[in-house]
Amino acid sequence: MIRQYLEIKKQYPDAILFFRLGDFYEMFFDDARLASRELEITLTGRDGGSERVPMCGIPYHAADGYIARLISKGYRVAICEQVEDPAEAKGIVRREVTRVITPGTVTEGHFLEDKKNNYLASIAPFEEGYGLAVTDITTGVFMVSSFSGVRAWSELIDEMARLNPAEVIIPLAYSDKMGGDLKQQGILAVSGYRDTAFSPAEAVPAFEEQFGSAGSLCNRTIDYHAAVAAAGALLIFLRETQKRVLKHINKAAFYRPGKYMILDANTRRNLELTRAISDGSRRNTLLSVIDHTVTAMGGRLLRNWIEQPLLDVAEIKARLEATEDLAGNAMLRLELKSLLKNVYDLERLTGKISFGTANARDLIGLKKSLANLPLIKQLLLAQAGAALLKDVARSIDPLEEVRELLEAAIDDNPPLSLKDGGIIKKGYNHEVDRLRQARREGKSMLAGLEERERARTGIKSLKVGFNKVFGYYIEVTRANLELVPEDYQRRQTLANAERFITPELKEYEDMILRAEERLASLERRLFDEVLERLSGEIHRIQKSASAIATADALYSLAEAAVKGRYSRPEIAEDGKLHVKDGRHPVLEQVMGPGRFVPNDTFMDNEESRFILLTGPNMAGKSTYMRQVALIVLLAQIGSFVPALFARIPVFDRIFTRVGASDDIAGGQSTFMVEMNECRIIVNEATEKSLIIMDEVGRGTSTYDGISIARALAEYIHTKIRAKTLFSTHYHELTDLDSMPGIVNFNVAVREEGEDIIFLRKVVPGKSDRSYGIQVARLAGLPGEIINRSMEILKTLELAAERPPQPSPAKEWPAYRYKENECHVIQELRRLNVLEMTPLEAINKLYMLHKKLTESATLKTTSL
């Protein structure tokens, strides 16, 4: 048996092998050590000849929970089942791996989030870029894209941040090169897969077998070879792990990420669109505020809308029109919600049908869902006015014949397992009805036999029973054994009774069990036939599921608009952004009605495209800037916005440089993280972007910080010309308002003695104080520290008013140098400043300053 295990394990070296032994899954050798540690189960051993074999095991009926724990940690699990009856086996029972479960191929509902796709991605490098294929095998979605040019990898990483796949496969030859960057995006499972799967020789046939001619992508992308390579490798991986053809994956949808607003990982994190920074949950995120979806399908679609804001004005206006239509009709919303409640997750049901794992209760859920489709269709056609809602209604296929099949074939209240019987409805199949009648008659005969035997023997406690090991029996207590007739044959002895069989009982047993065996086999065959017929209708079910998801997502936007008192934004084509009484959608909900202070925003293309925002900590600068970004994003997904009035131009990207933290794993300081984020902004932002920059330069010394912040502000204003909200504590920057297009705003406070009151109102003009000590007092720092802080502040302010004195340090011999001995000055002389960008100049200045500082430190130490 161990030899059999080792032969199978050799085929799946990168998976933990769950090896079926009776009622347990056993693991051996290194798999056992790993599973014992990760699952916290006892590590034992068994005799393996020359050495003791480490082993551990779990009950097969409890395997799902253990598998889920391993998958959540990024492991793969190969399920090895007994594929023949042990009673009929000659020698070792034949075993085969029936499925490999990986983070991206999980299908069981209890492993998954209902309202989140579980994506599996494949990346294929090529000479000028990358091909990408993405699937969610639980729903059948399969998407293909490609990235080329100098920014190909950066764009691909941004797309990975949006998709947040559970697993990514890449060519084995590229696993070291690409794996690190992908894992930095939080993708736990990044796996090298055999290179040949990405080659045209294997990938193209796999693609064409699943979808038809690969040439269908030729007209859509010049990089179709890379896209097909990624898609083909993904399909090969699925076939090798799932051991079946997935019929519900029937369409490869090519898409261009450039069709949507681009949001990099920093922006998604800083705006907390779908995951909170604090704990990674959806609590207190934008999604949590606007998600009023009723179905799991609608929830997944709404999440995708948030992560992919639109750029096409016509599409934005179509969603806004539909949202307005629903928001203005309370009865329509109420009826639609009521009907949607009865629609199950049709997308994932098609996955179960394709996998052959759908049970009878799943089919009853499908039947109930289909019964509501014509009602939803009629409701929208009759009451909706928006063109998008009409299109949705026309896309709903009622699938009447499918519902009629399920109504006729499947019992209305079936058991969960086929083994329990009773799944096929009475009247669907004559033979099923006949066998059930025979079984009932046999059991009625058993009841008559029991009565006759009690009368014949005089044993009133005599009873006829059944168990799976011994079959039917007559049980007699020990006190009555002397009354047992001679024709009773002993079958089993118990502590307080004995069990017998008679020729008549044996005849009834054969009749009943024969009927039950035939009935179970027939029900299984009929159920499989129903599943096969349903698998032929998967495409139609998916089409209706997509329409229902769209209706649900639009309902959610309308419900959020009504509950949040949102207004419909105008889409501006002149580039001007105007928000009246804008509010932060998440904080407003957290704080409760009427407590959030609204603020206005106006930005145009010339006079006020750059807002320089000052004010104390805790005053609300970051909240205000995020608020503007979220209002823009909501408008571009086709949602109403939290404002009295909003006029929003279409932005191609939103950038955020907010917060400060070290990247310890990446070996980057707070300041380096900040500068990397700034580099991305200045390299990738355009005139049509929205930039949010909060406290740039605070990760370094004051003068360095001021210099960098000022240079960045000037560069963004003059070179990029993007609409920008730029907050700072450096009051020296407020004179930037002398440049046309830069305006000063501050967050107002009111002073009362030594205390301040935050008014949370953004008003024109600059702030000349940071109120840091007052904020420290509010935070509860001891009075002794506060008082000492005030003394130090006064001393520093007085010193700032005196003329600067020469530093004695400059007279120290250790700091004297000759010009021809200073490499820094020589390097400065070689620089061509006119050919450098402001950011390059800043970075060079920073490095030269660092060299001088290190040199001075070394000389001082040598003294």
From Swiss-Prot:
Residues noted as binding ATP in the record, renumbered to the chain: G615, P616, N617, M618, A619, G620, K621, S622
DNA damage recorded as keyword: yes
CDD domains assigned to the protein according to its UniProt record, in alphabetical order: ABC_MutS1 (cd03284)
Single GO BP term: mismatch repair
Top-level lineage group: Bacteria
GO cellular component, one term: cytosol
InterPro entries documented for this protein: DNA_mismatch_repair_MutS, DNA_mismatch_repair_MutS-lik_N, DNA_mismatch_repair_MutS/MSH, DNA_mismatch_repair_MutS_C, DNA_mismatch_repair_MutS_clamp, DNA_mismatch_repair_MutS_core, DNA_mismatch_repair_MutS_N, DNA_mismatch_repair_MutS_sf
Molecular-function GO terms, alphabetical: ATP binding; ATP-dependent DNA damage sensor activity; damaged DNA binding; mismatched DNA binding
Keywords of this entry: ATP-binding, DNA damage, DNA repair, DNA-binding, Nucleotide-binding
Annotated function: This protein is involved in the repair of mismatches in DNA. It is possible that it carries out the mismatch recognition step. This protein has a weak ATPase activity.
Family, per entry: Belongs to the DNA mismatch repair MutS family.
NCBIfam families in the cross-refs: mutS1, PRK05399.1
UniProt-recorded name of the protein: DNA mismatch repair protein MutS
Gene: mutS
